[in-house]
Amino acid sequence: MSALTPVMLLLSLFILPAHASSGPVLLTSSSIGLFCVGLFVLAYALVMAEEYLQLRKSKPVLVAAGVIWILIGIAYAQQGMSPVAEQAFRHTLLEYAELMLFLLVAMTYINAMEDRRLFDALRAWLVRSGFHLRTLFWLTGWLAFCISPMADNLTTALLMCAVVLKVADGDRRFVNLACINIVIAANAGGAFSPFGDITTLMVWQAGKVQFGQFFTLLIPSLLNFLVPAILMSLMVPRHVPEADNEVVDLKRGARRIVALFLLTIITAVLCHSFLHLPPVLGMMLGLGYLQFFGFYLRKSLPRSLARKRALYERNGDEVRLRSLGSVVPFDVFNKVAKAEWDTLLFFYGVVMCVGGLGFMGYLELVSHWLYDAGDPTMANIFIGVLSSVIDNIPVMFAVLSMNPDMALGQWLLVTLTAGVGGSLLSIGSAAGVALMGQAHGMYTFFGHLKWLPAILLGYLVSIGAHLWLNSAQF
C-alpha cells in the first residue's frame, strides 16, 4: 500500500464514480449521497471535539443518522421502492439492537459490582499496600490488562487511574507514565476477549471469529502491553509513597454477583457455540439471574440488617452501627439506568450512519481501494492506525459492513489492530479520553505523544508476533 493510499481512501468517498452500490438505486455520485457523506464527516468532527465543545458525542451522530436515512427514504420513495429502504433500515437496526442489549447487560453487571464496592475494595488494598511507585506502575498495568477482558476497558482504566492519583501525591511525571501504561494495558487486554471491547464483541457477533479463537491474540496483546511498559518503567522512580489505611467492606452479595456475571458469560458462549443462537440471548438470560438475585437481596435485607446490628452492638462498633442507617436496598433497574447511555446512543448513531452510507454504496468503494486493490495485511495495519484518530467502533463496523473476503488470520489481525491501535494517541480510545479528564493537567495529549515511538514499537511487535505465531490461519 503506497503512502498516498490513506489520502485516496478519504477522497474516494467524495470523488469516485458510482461503479458499485449495495442498493438498487445508485446514490454514490448523487447530490444526496455526497450530502450524506459530508453530514457524517461533520457529525464525526463534532464527536472528536467533544471535550472542547462539552457536547455529548451521541447528539451529532443521532441527528446525522436520522437525516441520512430520511434522505435514503425520499430517494427510494421517488423510485417506488420504499420497501427496499425499509428492509435495509430494519436489518441495520437489528444489528444494533443485538449489540446494544448485549452491552446493556454487561454495563449493568459492572454497575452492580461497583455498587457492591468491589472496585473500591481493590483500590483501597492497592493504596494501603505500601508498594513503591515502580511496583504500583506494574501492578496497575497488569491489573488493567487482566480485568479489561471481563470488564470494559473504560471502567478498568478509570479504576486504576483512581489508584494512581491516590498514591501519586501530585507527582505529574509518575501520573503521566502510569496513565499511559494503563491505557495501553486496558486496550491490549480487551483485544483478545469478545467481552473486552465493543469491536471484539462486534467481530464475535458477526461470526467472523469464534469465541475460543480470540485467545490466539493473547501473546500479541501481551507484547503490545509489555514492550512500552518495560521502556517506560525505566523512568519510574522507586520512591515509596505514604500509605493510606483506608479499609473498604464489600456490600452483601458482591462475590455472588461476580459469580453470576461469570455464569452469564458462560450462558452467552454456550448459546452461540452450541445452539448457534445470538449471544445476546444468553446475556439477557443473565440479566434475569441478576434480577432474581436482586429480589432476594431486597427481601432478605431486614434480616441481614438485624443480624449485623446485633453483632455491632455486641462488639461496641459505633462506626458500623451508624453506617447501617445509610444502607440502600439493591435495585437492578437503578443499575440499568446508570448504564453508559451516551455510549449506547452514540453506538446507534454510528451504526445507522455507516449502515446508511454502506447501503448507498460507499463502503463498497472503500473496500475496493482498501482490500481488493491492496494488500489485506497492510490494509488491516492501516485500520489500526486509523483507530488512533477515529474511534474504533465506526472503523470496525465499516470493515464488517464491507465484509471483505479474508482468512481467519486477517480477521484476527484487524481485531488486534483496531483494539490496540487506539493506544497510539491519547484521543484514540475511550480509556485515553476519560483519563485525560480524570487526571486533568497531569496526563495530557502531548505527554502521551512523547512516548509514541515506544507505543508504536509495541504495536508493530504485536503485529509481527501475530503474523508469526498464527501464520497457519492466513
Question: Which residues does each PLM region occupy?
Answer:
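Transmembrane helical segments that form the transport core of multi-pass membrane transport proteins
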Residues: K59, E86, N111, R116, ...
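Membrane-interfacial helix-loop connectors
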Residues: S22, I68-A77, L94, A144-G189, ...
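Hydrophobic core segments of alpha-helical transmembrane domains in multi-pass membrane transport
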Residues: M8-L13, V37-A49, A64-G73, L103-N111, ...
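N-terminal secretory/membrane targeting signals
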Residues: M1-A20
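Interfacial loop-to-helix junctions that mark the boundaries of transmembrane helices
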Residues: G23-I32, Y52-P60, P83-A97, F211-P220, ...
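Juxtamembrane and boundary regions of transmembrane helices in multi-pass small-molecule transporters
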Residues: R172-N176, A188, F192-S193, M202-V203, ...
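Hydrophobic mid-bilayer segments of alpha-helices in multi-pass membrane transport proteins
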Residues: I32-Y44, Q54-Q79, Y96-T108, L159, ...
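Transmembrane alpha-helix boundary signature
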Residues: A18-S22, L71-H91, M100, L104-A124, ...
